[in-house]
Amino acid sequence: RRQRWIIDVQQHLSAILLVNYPRDMKRGEKRPAILACHGHGVHGKEPVMGNDSSPALRQDIAAHNYNYGQVMAEQGFITYAIDWIGFGERNDNNKPNHRPQSGRDWCNIYYLHATMLGMTSISINVAHGKAATDVVCKLPGVDEKRLGVMGLSGGGTMTLWMALCDKRFKAAEIMCYSDLWAAFGIRDINYCGMQVAPGLFKLMDLPDVQGLIAPRPLLIDIGVHDTCFKVDTAMECYRQVEKIYRAAGVTENLELDLHAGEHGWGGNKSEAFFKKHLSF
């Protein structure tokens, strides 16, 4: 069962919120809810939440095992998602009187706009994700004390920052966003404006940022054949995060899904992970 809401994410700005309810929910029952963060792609939240109404959407889902917002709802969780700025229904190409971006990435354009106002794309998206979570926590059937967050690639970035900035999330799954800055940032130039903040990597590397989630439970997905975040440096990132969890005395709260696929959701441990840590 899918609901589509129009919500205010800040003053004078609205977004579409999708909510998937499990079919077996009973009246008056409370279930854990998971924020399903989408990554790059013109369709935004739609394939993640199971919209397969066009060949392009079906191709997105097949390429990245991308419909985790649908699958997790089928496994009993309430799931929800919004479009981050510049994606899906919030893509400027869909707005009246838009100006073509001449082939430039909307992520980078929005980052430039945000920095001129003293903000970043990450901070804006986190604020909008928190606003969506505020709404979801008031919906019938949602147990606001059992929230999780998960996402692939750019959605992995957002999963990381949502977990860090909103302690309501009790468990997180970061998919195909593990690496070292020298590798994905400098060697591969595999990042965009929705994934960075000024001066961040003078202070710490990506494993350090992921380690800040400790002691809360964290599941990391790494694709052996991922061409975006290469497995060698992705695993080095994981090993450094593992050291942080060991130092915190919570090694049991860190899990790895090292799957044989490319840049996509492994899906091998997600159900058990969230059911364990969201008490379901």
Predicted regions and their residues:
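Glycine-rich nucleophile elbow surrounding the catalytic serine of serine-hydrolase chemistry
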Residues: G151-A163
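Mobile cap/lid helix-loop segments that gate and shape the active-site cleft of serine hydrolases
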Residues: N108-M116, I124, A131-A132, F169-Q210, ...
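Acidic catalytic loop of the alpha/beta-hydrolase fold
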Residues: V224-D232, H263-W265
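N-terminal cap/lid segment of alpha/beta-hydrolase-fold proteins
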Residues: R1-A33
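Short beta-strand/loop motif that positions the catalytic acidic residue
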Residues: I213, I220-I222
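C-terminal catalytic histidine-bearing segment of alpha/beta-hydrolase fold enzymes
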Residues: R239, Y245-F280
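Alpha/beta-hydrolase fold nucleophile elbow
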Residues: P140-S153
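Cap/lid segment of the alpha/beta-hydrolase catalytic domain
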Residues: E29, C37-A127, C137-K138, F184-R187
